[in-house]
Amino acid sequence: MKTIISLIFIMFPLFVSAHNGNFYRADSRSPNEIKDLGGLYPRGYYDFFERGTPMSISLYDHARGAPSGNTRYDDGFVSTTTDIDSAHEIGQNILSGYTEYYIYLIAPAPNLLDVNAVLGRYSPHPQENEYSALGGIPWTQVIGWYVVNNGVLDRNIHRNRQFRADLFNNLSPALPSESYQFAGFEPEHPAWRQEPWINFAPPGCGRNVRLTKHINQQDCSNSQEELVYKKLQDLRTQFKVDKKLKLVNKTSSNNIIFPNHDFIREWVDLDGNGDLSYCGFTVDSDGSRKRIVCAHNNGNFTYSSINISLSDYGWPKGQRFIDANGDGLVDYCRVQYVWTHLYCSLSLPGQYFSLDKDAGYLDAGYNNSRAWAKVIGTNKYSFCRLTSNGYICTDIDSYSTAFKDDDQGWADSRYWMDIDGNGGDDYCRLVYNWTHLRCNLQGKDGLWKRVESKYLDGGYPSLRFKIKMTSNKDNYCRIVRNHRVMECAYVSDNGEFHNYSLNMPFSLYNKNDIQFIDIDGDNRDDICRYNSAPNTMECYLNQDKSFSQNKLVLYLSAKPISSLGSGSSKIIRTFNSEKNSSAYCYNAGYGTLRCDEFVIY
């Protein structure tokens, strides 16, 4: 058997792509047309985004083409070849009816897959030496073009001034070992049970097909689709092209009991699996009984209601749904008795808020100073507050850290946030005449360090935000200068404040109907707002300390009855799926929770 496998590898050099130079494609469309379209994109690309029709992401199907021999109408790849003469020959065969056509010169990059290497002996046309571009080729990847007039190739290149050498220099096509999972063979194809593809087969592909054929076929198709679309997302992020939003699903969950807006309510990872549920309180119509209610996320943005009764829900200031013991499950914590005990109802797998734990006596501090902050080096949250002895943070195991400061800052400016990126929440607020930002930084040694900015604009009241503008640090941001500019500050690695400004994509006057959230999976918060007139969500992506001017629009399937970010209307992410999707979930009335799921490509 080892001998046979060795022979296969000799006959098919499956782990090495032979070409690392530039690539070529013959096309009838002019450079201006290609530029206006944003690049060389496949036929299925436009219908995928504009009409919602499926795009074929099977490299095997792309290489085979349609039964007529033409390109598939739903094709998700763009063909290229490795030398200009081959491109000229292809052009003469398929574009002979055009007096003039073009051969585009394309820079190597990981969106290009070596068809022969990936498909091996199953490559239908190995003589073509084709490299296929997954999802197409952005205009910024095109180095230039040659003109073919009446069949004669002019070898003088016309340079593309929009070519991004800073992005595409020194890149290479995707390695076969990175691409076998994208081969796109049918679920029952023998390749999935052979070397090398068996080692890269997505779940359900080629394994025990005869035993559970239908399930495996569906699993194989779904897993291949998720892998390819995640790859497409990553490529578009790497190439810094304008991204697109695609609606992928609409769900409607009925008989949902929504939390009462008079109490705390939060979207939380109730099960520790990345799917957010909506939890809060409700009170019987006669006011006789209070309960915790959660719209529990069952997966795929479908929900059902759960109810939990407790003997004591504690005082309003200090109530939170957080992970108190670091086990990944959400607990319910509060201050009980005469503001003297920290109490948490801990969750067990499938048993929410079922195990009560008392941290013992403590000074609960001043009402408006109470907050929960993430403890550095753990997944726990601690209860933090200002007391007569200074600031104290205490966890459910009664471990405390403390610091003193002579200025607790303005009430409408206080945030607990990881402004220095070390994994623990710091206490930040505006001091003096809203002119300086002061933070007490949580250190890994349990000690606290105070830092203060130089003069800055504290911004408009109620328009101050905690935003992850960069991938590893929370930024303290304020709306300033006629509501069109945002200034943000963070603590740099040398321990000093860095303040910068950026233009907003729209004027921002209040917090209603906006939300900062990462919708494209790059660990940076984007900005979204609800527009009531056309009933749409509009988002602008974070481009690292700036927001794109390219507006992404989602048309909602129903009308939300509350404003975005107010509680029952929220954009949420799912983190347990390769497709990296988000959804705008909202109370549509009559006990219905609607979720319009979308993906950013």
Curated annotation (Swiss-Prot):
Keyword Signal: yes
Catalytic activity line of the entry: L-arginyl-[protein] + NAD(+) = N(omega)-(ADP-D-ribosyl)-L-arginyl-[protein] + nicotinamide + H(+)
Domain of life assignment: Bacteria
Disulfide bond residue pairs: C205-C220
InterPro entries recorded: Enterotoxin_A (IPR001144), Integrin_alpha_N (IPR028994)
GO cellular component, one term: extracellular space
Record bears the keyword Nucleotide-binding: yes
Gene3D superfamilies reported for this sequence: Heat-Labile Enterotoxin, subunit A (3.90.210.10)
EC number: 2.4.2.31
Endpoints of the signal sequence: 1-18
Keywords, alphabetical: Disulfide bond, Enterotoxin, Glycosyltransferase, NAD, NADP, Nucleotide-binding, Nucleotidyltransferase, Secreted, Signal, Toxin, Transferase, Virulence
Binding site for NAD(+): 26-43, 130
Pfam families with a match to the protein in the record: Enterotoxin_a
SUPFAM superfamilies: ADP-ribosylation (SSF56399), Integrin alpha N-terminal domain (SSF69318)
Single GO molecular function: toxin activity
Localization (cell): Secreted
Active site per database record: E130
Enzyme class, spelled out: transferase
Known function: A probable mono(ADP-ribosyl)transferase, it may ADP-ribosylate Arg in target protein(s). Upon expression in yeast cells causes cell death.
Note: Toxins are often highly strain specific; not encoded in strain ATCC 39315 / El Tor Inabe N16961.
Protein family according to the UniProt entry: Belongs to the enterotoxin A family.
UniProt protein name: NAD(+)--arginine ADP-ribosyltransferase Chelt
